[in-house]
Swiss-Prot record:
This is DNA-directed RNA polymerase subunit beta. Its EC number is 2.7.7.6. DNA-dependent RNA polymerase catalyzes the transcription of DNA into RNA using the four ribonucleoside triphosphates as substrates. It catalyses: RNA(n) + a ribonucleoside 5'-triphosphate = RNA(n+1) + diphosphate. One of its GO terms (biological process) is DNA-templated transcription. Residues 1160-1184 are annotated as: Disordered. The gene is rpoB. GO terms for molecular function: DNA binding; DNA-directed RNA polymerase activity; ribonucleoside binding. The lineage of its organism: Bacteria, Bacillati, Bacillota, Bacilli, Bacillales. GO terms for cellular component: DNA-directed RNA polymerase complex.
Length: 1184
């Protein structure tokens, strides 16, 4: 197939790309953060009302008072989004609820509106602002409520079955077989009972009733033999003893216990999704498919025969009788006696012959279409689920795969919030009931009954500390977008890392088009945290749906009609791939088409195809769809590529890739990092911080101008990860803009496209071994021209509190600090904006009162004369930590007097923002988009870099050995196509699974006038001689990752010590030392390096006296004294003594060595000598 030259596609206002796509897309990508916004909107519109409806009315124990929830409304938020961030507040709106209190004795009605706390609002970008920080609520993947059947082998290898009825909340019902072919039931994880006990308790007391109901079979006979009860009352008592062991059982108690466990909507909730799944599973049609009828089916109304005995129900026959099934064929009304429920039970029952035995009849029982709004389980559900279990034992029916996405659903923001709110409301309900019984009924008002504390607390707890409420990843727009589309199987009610096996983590065929098979973290969470595929949507039940183009069964044409299918609906259809060839009419050109049916990939006759994929990229997530030539990369490397793009640091001068995939525009627009137009209009005014757009609308075919929309751009703000969040205008005055168009680029954006890195000239070659093990050699040009320079903003804060000895004070007047150190502080002791600061410089001068000592008479006299301060103060100023130098960007001051909300005990809070400009540096980590990552090992002068025949030096040298074994060939194709694109002055788009193939790349290379093999001769920059072989040189898109050497570099001279062991702390955060561990000690022992070893184990570590003396000796230039006894040895002896052993330390001549107990004085002296801080909390003691 020869390469086609591609066609031009416009992405936004400023960018045209040559696209190599062959498949025309029928469906636009949906709004990528819809999963967040739609779910929260549902919560505001429906979810809240649903909850108030569930809990209303609240009645007191006597039934005299009743409190009803009438209506609710959300007010205006107290602060805007920006202001909430600045003030460390929540972006929230007051929730007011209208209540009605009815006094049933007097008939008096009181209405009142009650404030129920501030409710956090979602911003337009799909995030929440909690305490000034942007957070995202991640959607959770959980097992859907419903009834599940699974096959299992016992220890003898005999096949048995298990089944579970899982509610949304409430008691579980589990059925299982044992080695003796007895069917047992467990109620709510208690000891097992024969299943017939449960049936008797439902009111089918005698053996004969049970046999008539379920149908005669060996399993049932075995179970009845094992069953000790013989009527409903005994069965009820038996169940009560299991559920409430040790309590005296009575029949009435047992009845009410079972009713409250299963049939009370407040205690047992299937949710609408559970009801839907149970009705679907227990429907007769799946069990009747391809079975032989053992009775004649007659329409109950007309009396006509629908199907006769001995008919085989294939797909066609079954489709014909399904409407009759729904009209009541086979309905039986059961009249239970003495059971839990008095009412009759309606089931649907049909007899068939056993699949492996034509003589044997089997009863199939369904639950006869229970209404959607019945959210608790019913007796007919229990009977039909038991019937299904017996059917399974005879080979009728299917077991379920719990990893199938038809059985796993998403709990998104709205539902998670609703569950949390429900917990708060039910706690409140208890309080209301208590208050109703205590207070005077005549004067009481709704306001006095309600206590909003539990509701507010449960919402606060959810946003503040739930596993699913996460600090937003704001490194770059792609990280932000991916975080909002993340699906986690962890969290409350989900799995735990330790318990999750391989099956749950694995890719499943039902993930196709719903969850990305590639993007997931490496490490312990692999497969438990996933990403939503690009076209996927979530339906009202929380199942993920993916779009398919419908194939018209009459004409076999692929239509543009789109159906969204869930995973279990898709199981019934044959689906063709998106790249199947079609002619102009939309029919398949080939007789046999590659298609999927469930887990199979088959070649199918074109007439059998029901649906076709909408797009090749519907399989993968947004981040994965940004990798060009994904189809040429190994999946493990593609995973790393997708994950590393999210860690790209926004650069000072971003540049969109020459070789893109066409996803760059959409993902940048939907991420929320760009400024987008809210209405059509004309740009009137553009400046760095503001864009004005005059609205324009069409009325009766005429243009009408409206008001002005003002968009403010955020300049140089610190993101959650300390990168620089900066927006720049993308339009000019006079431009016409349409709704949704990008007006301002966010961080890592260029001309309205995602721009995570830079296009650089790359050669695949070695150079003196400096790129061994994936290391990267770089030209100094990239440093000089600020190609990979990024801006980082760090925030430091200092608060003045009230202490027991008096308030702390922010001041310039600091003890023992020279004027030189204070030169950049203003009169309040706060650093000025624009000052350049280095390690250990003062940012905020602050003093804390020390304890006042008794003064001598002379001192008192002096103080009286000179008015000296008698109080002693200690310097507790905020200083720049190691490696934190830079330029002061901004200072924010919050005080009580100015009316700022501060935590209790804090009088003043100062925040200082320091900005750093970081150029690329040896030790920084870089990567391409194909999982090809490496650390910069050497930055060479431009003149030493290899250069091309026209004299251009290359920018980066990568090791060619990094390609073959990693199998990410995509980077080589990108290299050549990028070179051609640069030569032609174009940008190209090569969408995943439908992009440029090898021929396209070669034809573009030829068009650009490059050599046929796309390689070139390179000359050594040092000697000017040509290298032996031709070398692949091209343009690759490389990104700088957030793992920067400046954040990791760390050195300690002396510093804090752990309190008990007196050993140095570890880690950069604690200013710790390097651990010299067990194995390192062995290495020194092997060389017999006794003195080195001794000083490492004593004076460099925990010989308290020795290290102080050593420090003094070094300062004075004397020789280092003999080491003493390490503190850890003393700790060991103290531990032995505390166990009651008499252990003494003896010297060489058997003299006892006195162990000196450390006093507080020693600590202070030592601290002065070392200028160190004693860690006051045990958390700082990072012990191994």
């Amino acid at each position: 197939m020869s390469g086609h030259s591609g066609h031009d596609v416009k992405y936004g206002r400023h960018r045209t790309r040559r696209s190599f796509a062959r498949i025309s897309e029928v469906l636009e990508l949906p709004n990528l953060i819809e999963i967040q916004t739609a779910s929260y909107q549902w919560f505001l519109d429906e979810g809240l009302r649903e909850m108030f409806r569930d809990i209303s009315p609240i009645e007191d124990f006597a039934g005299n008072l009743s409190l009803e929830f009438i209506d609710y409304d959300l007010g205006e938020p107290k602060y805007s989004v920006e202001e909430s961030k600045n003030r460390d507040a929540n972006y929230a709106a007051p929730l007011r609820v209208k209540l009605r209190l009815i006094n049933k004795e007097t008939g008096e009605v009181k209405d009142q509106e009650v404030f129920m706390g501030d409710f956090p609002l979602m911003t337009e970008m799909g995030t929440f602002i909690i305490n000034g920080a942007e957070r995202v609520i991640v959607s959770q993947l959980v097992r859907s409520p419903g009834v599940y059947f699974n096959g299992k082998l016992d220890k003898n290898g005999k096949k048995g079955f298990g089944s579970t009825v899982i509610p949304n909340r409430g008691a579980w019902l589990e059925y299982e077989t044992d080695a003796k072919d007895v069917v047992h039931v467990r109620i709510d994880r208690t000891r097992k009972l024969p299943v017939t006990v449960l049936l008797r308790a439902l009111g089918f007391g005698s053996d004969q009733e049970i046999i008539d109901l379920i149908g005669d079979n060996d399993y049932l006979r075995n179970t009845l033999e094992k069953d000790n009860t013989d009527n409903a009352e005994k069965a009820l008592l038996e169940i009560y003893e299991r559920l409430r062991p040790g309590e005296p059982p009575t029949v009435d108690n047992a009845r009410s216990l079972l009713v409250s466990r299963f049939f009370d909507p407040k205690r047992y909730d299937l949710a609408s999704v559970g009801r839907y799944k149970i009705n679907k599973k227990l429907h007769l049609k799946n069990r009747l498919f391809n079975q032989t009828l053992a009775e004649t089916l007659v329409d109950p109304e007309t009396g006509e025969i629908i199907a006769s005995k001995g008919d085989i129900l294939d797909r066609r026959n079954l489709d014909q009788i399904i409407p009759n099934l729904e009209n009541g064929v086979g309905f039986r009304t059961l009249r239970p006696t003495d059971g839990v429920m008095e009412d009759s039970v309606l089931v649907q029952s049909i007899k068939i012959y056993a699949p492996n035995d034509d003589e044997k009849e089997i009863n199939i029982i369904g639950n006869a279409y229970i209404e959607e709004n019945v959210k608790h389980i019913t007796p007919s559900d229990i009977i039909s689920s038991i019937s299904y279990f017996f059917n399974l034992l005879h080979g009728v029916g299917d077991t379920d795969d719990i990893d199938h996405l038809g059985n796993r659903r998403l709990r998104s923001v709205g539902e998670l919030l609703q569950n949390q709110f429900r917990i708060g409301l039910s706690r409140m309900e208890r309080v209301v009931r208590e208050r109703m019984s205590i207070q005077d009924m005549t004067t009481i008002t709704p306001q006095q009954l309600i206590n909003i504390r539990p509701v507010v607390a449960s919402i606060k707890e959810f946003f503040g500390s739930s596993q699913l409420s996460q600090f937003m990843d704001q490194t770059n727009p792609l990280g932000e977008l991916t975080h909002k589309r993340r699906l986690s199987a962890l969290g409350p009610g989900g799995l735990t890392r330790e318990r999750a096996g391989y099956e749950v983590r694995d890719v499943h065929y039902s993930h196709y088009g719903r969850m990305c098979p590639i993007e997931t973290p490496e490490g312990p969470n692999i497969g438990l945290i996933n990403s939503l595929s690009s076209f996927a949507k979530v339906n009202k039940f929380g199942f993920i749906e993916t779009p398919y183009r419908r194939v018209d069964p009459e004409t076999n044409r692929v239509t543009d009609k789109i159906d969204y299918l869930t995973a279990d609906e898709e199981d019934n259809y044959v689906v063709a791939q998106a790249n199947s060839k079609l002619d102009e009419q939309g029919t398949f050109t080939e007789e046999e088409v590659m298609a999927r049916f469930r887990s199979e990939n088959l070649a199918v006759e074109k007439e059998r195809i029901d649906y076709m994929d909408v797009s090749p990229k519907q399989v993968v997530s947004v981040a994965t769809a940004c990798i060009p030539f994904l189809e040429n990369d190994d999946s493990n490397r593609a995973l790393m590529g997708a994950n590393m793009q999210r860690q790209a640091v926004p650069l000072m001068h971003p540049e969109a890739p020459f070789v893109g995939t066409g996803m760059e525009h959409v993902s940048a627009k939907d991420s929320g990092a760009a400024v987008t137009a809210k209405h059509d209009g004309i740009v009137e005014h553009v400046e760095a911080r503001e864009i004005w757009v005059r609205r324009v609308s069409l009325v009766d075919g005429k243009e009408v101008t409206g008001g002005i929309d003002k968009y403010t751009l955020r300049k140089f703000v610190r993101s959650n990860q300390g990168t620089c969040y900066n927006q720049r205008p993308n339009v000019a005055e006079g431009d016409r803009v349409v709704k949704g168009e990008i007006l301002g680029n966010g961080p890592s954006m260029d001309s309205g496209e995602l721009a995570l890195g830079r296009n650089v000239l790359v050669a695949f070659m070695t150079w003196d071994g400096y790129n061994y093990e994936d290391a990267i050699i770089m030209s100094e040009r990239l440093v000089k021209d600020d190609v990979y320079t990024s801006i980082h903003i760090e925030e430091f804060e200092s608060e003045a509190r009230d202490t027991k000895l008096g308030p702390e004070e922010m001041t310039r007047d600091i003890p023992n600090v020279g004027e030189d150190a204070l030169r950049d502080l203003d009169e309040r002791g706060i650093i000025r904006v624009g000052a350049e600061v280095k390690d250990n410089d003062l940012l905020v001068g602050k003093v804390t009162p020390k304890g006042v000592t008794e003064l001598t008479a002379e001192e008192r006299l002096l103080h009286a004369i000179f008015g000296e301060k008698a109080r002693e103060v200690r310097d507790t100023s905020l200083r720049v930590p190691h490696g934190g130098g830079g330029i002061v960007l901004d200072v924010k001051i919050f005080t009580r007097e100015a009316g700022d909300e501060l935590p209790p005990g804090v009088n003043q809070l100062v925040r200082v923002y320091i900005v750093q400009k970081r150029k690329i540096h040896e030790g920084d980590k870089m990567a391409g988009r194909h999982g090809n990552k490496g650390v910069i090992s050497r930055i060479l002068p431009e003149e030493d870099m290899p250069f091309m025949p026209d004299g251009t030096p290359v920018d980066i040298m990568l090791n060619p050995l990094g390609v073959p074994s990693r199998m990410n060939i995509g980077q080589v194709l990108e290299l050549h196509l990028g070179m051609a694109a640069r030569a032609l002055g174009i940008h190209v788009a090569t969408p995943v699974f439908d992009g440029a193939n090898e021929e396209d790349v070669w034809s573009t290379v030829e068009e650009a006038g490059m050599a046929r093999d796309a390689k070139t001769i390179l000359y050594d920059g040092r000697s000017g001689e040509a290298f032996d072989n031709r070398i692949s040189v091209g343009v690759m898109y490389m990104i700088k990752l957030a793992h920067m050497v400046d954040d990791k570099l760390h050195a300690r001279s002396t510093g804090p010590y752990s309190l008990v062991t007196q050993q140095p702390l570890g880690g950069k955060a604690q200013f710790g030392g390097q651990r010299f561990g067990e194995m390192e000690v062995w290495a020194l022992e092997a060389y017999g390096a006794a003195y080195t070893l001794q000083e490492i184990l004593t004076i460099k570590s925990d010989d308290v006296v020795g290290r102080v003396k050593t420090y003094e000796a070094i300062v004075k230039g004397e020789s280092v004294p003999e080491p003493g006894v390490p503190e850890s040895f003393k700790v060991l002896i103290k531990e032995l003594q505390s166990l009651g052993m008499d252990v003494k330390m003896l010297s060489a001549d058997e003299e006892e060595i006195e162990m000196r107990d450390m006093d507080d004085d020693d600590f202070t002296n030592q601290n002065d000598a070392f200028n160190i801080v004693q860690p006051e909390n045990a958390a700082a003691e990072k012990t191994e």
